[in-house]
Amino acid sequence: MERGVRQLLADKISGNMIGLWLLIPEHLRLGTWDLLCGWSRQPGERVGPRLALQLIHESALCSAGLRNQRSLSQRGFELANGLPFVANDVAIHSLLAEHTVAESRRLQIALGQIRRTSGDFAGKLLAIDPHRTRSYSKRQMRRYRDDQKARPYKVAPTFFALDADTHQPVCFTIATSAQTATRAAIDLLEQAAEILASPAGKTLVLADVEHLAVELFSHVQLHTPFDLLVPMRNERWLQKQLRAIPSEQFTRRWAGFATMKRPYKMTSYAAGPFFQFVQRTGERPDAHYFGAFLSTTDRDEVNALTLDYPKRWHVEEFFNAHQALGWNRAGTMNLNIRYGQMTMALIAQAALHRTRRLLGEPYSGWDADHFAKSLLAGLEGDIRVHDDTIVVTYYNAPNADHLRQHYEGLPDHLQNEHIDPHIPWLYGFKLDFRFR
């Protein structure tokens, strides 16, 4: 492999996937290589970590489909992975199949802990949400229906936990379609607790009505450091109950909005108590509309309902913007393979987030597909070697002055951050950039 990589560098490369090399400094800052060596159980000289790096870069490029039907080679892609070739589907499939869900989960936890110490998570609000991707598998499986009028269909569910303040994913879990949202949420919160290491009462978990279950509330209250806030189903019995609350028990907050809170006992759960937050909208009694939320702890209901809970929708925004990284397709039903592939996409998202943050506007506002097409696979350039340094030159880079500020003289920038500028998967070469 090393001989092939050195030969490619000696021959020089021209292509339009040179933008992918902008991620390499972020891999060094993130410690991606050590994570991949640990996950693959192989030393850096072996091919396994490099195949995993190919998966990460495929995710960053939002590349999907059979590898033999793509044209990723001879454009600078394989060299960014430390390989003289683009690995085929069989090699990638074999790599993922060798590693279990537990190993990929440990990789997620290690990545999350690095991101936490780097300040990517505020750790105050955690939004959890299930995403069910339609599956066209011929396997027999439980079907899902989100609308009583629609026909049930096969799904491959993914459950995300997102920091609602920084809009960054903390972790995810997957399951078969038979898994309940409650059981999946318990697994997800156990994973998030290990990543965030939050003191008791610091983190509020925001969930949708699908997670209103005694089992989940019991688990959160007894076995996690988190608090939980979930809306109650807006059914007739609840509306009747809320309308029976005397008006003087509500506190008017501003025109058309009043709140109250009270202890709440679940009939099938002896511990507790929980707390019901009630909001009333409308000025006239005949126009009043009521809504209720259930919380595991007593807290300021106004902030919880008006400031905290609306941030749960950031998880929907995140998924819409970044699902093209590899979370919008069901693929195989082999959970080892799916979990591994989607975890590599999580690493890709972490590197992309850091790159966006460094570049600023307009790049920071682009979704994953736009960023991949316009920057990672949209910059023309060449790759050559000068002494012990790989020099990447861009000829059409937008905002070249801004990019030059962050990327030219990269080895010195990294050393100033106390990061070794030698790239282990590129056999100890350093990396520098030029903008023409």
PLM region descriptions:
Residues 1-150, 160-178, 186-198, 222-223, ...:
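Dynamic "connector" segments at or just before major functional cores
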Residues 2, 34-35, 71-75, 199, ...:
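Short acidic (Asp/Glu) and glycine-rich catalytic loops that position anionic groups and cofactors
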Residues 39-43, 300-308, 324-339, 356-367:
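Short, solvent-exposed helix-loop connector elements
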Residues 55, 68-70, 88, 92, ...:
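Short, conserved catalytic/metal-binding motifs centered on acidic residues
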Residues 76, 134-136, 179-180, 211-215, ...:
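Flexible loop/turn segments at secondary-structure boundaries
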Residues 179-240:
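Domain-level cores of phosphate- or acyl-group-handling catalytic modules
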Residues 222-323, 412-436:
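An anionic, glycine-rich sequence signature occurring as long contiguous blocks
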Residues 352-384:
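Conserved nucleotidyltransferase catalytic core and NTase-mimicking acidic/glycine-rich helix/loop elements
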